[in-house]
Amino acid sequence: MEYRQCEWVGFNYASSVKDRRGKGIHFFLEDYQFTRLWGNIDYYVPMLSSYDSIMTPDFSLYTDFPIALQIYNHYRKHWIGAYLQQMGCHVVPTICWSDRESFRWCFDGEPTQGVVAVSSVGTQNSKKRREMFLEGYIEMMDRLQPTHVIFYGTVPEECRGDIVRIKAFSERFHEAEVSQW
């Protein structure tokens, strides 16, 4: 899969964007913002297919979630991605993990030597979370060997690869706020 440069818009704003050329959809949001996609995907396919790229949903894999729920969320991400591809959409896989134990399955079904997306939001606010994120990132790089990593949020200096950074909504909001001063 080739990398397509685009401006990324959260799924929660997808229906309000008028000119969708050069834009893609991400799901780096609270799960409640996009769970409706799982229950009624055919309703959203026409809108989503009008975008240049769509990342797979970033269903939560919190470390305190039961393993069955984590695997179920991983499955839902893959099912939605495969369905959107069948509908002709250009899909970018979102890669996520919870802890070292999740490495046994969280990279299953992901493409190698292609474009992937990750988010560091919520992972850099404690030493333990930061270390777990970096351990998963290194594991992802070793196993998947991505050509590009679309990175949402703060990029830790230890992260390597061809990183394409997307500013998190809070950063864009802060920049807009500061520019009005």
Identify the residue ranges that each predicted region occupies:
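Basic, amphipathic N-terminal segments that precede the first structured/catalytic domain
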Residues: 1-27
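Eukaryote-skewed repeat-based solenoidal scaffolds used as protein-protein interaction platforms
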Residues: 17-20, 30, 37-180
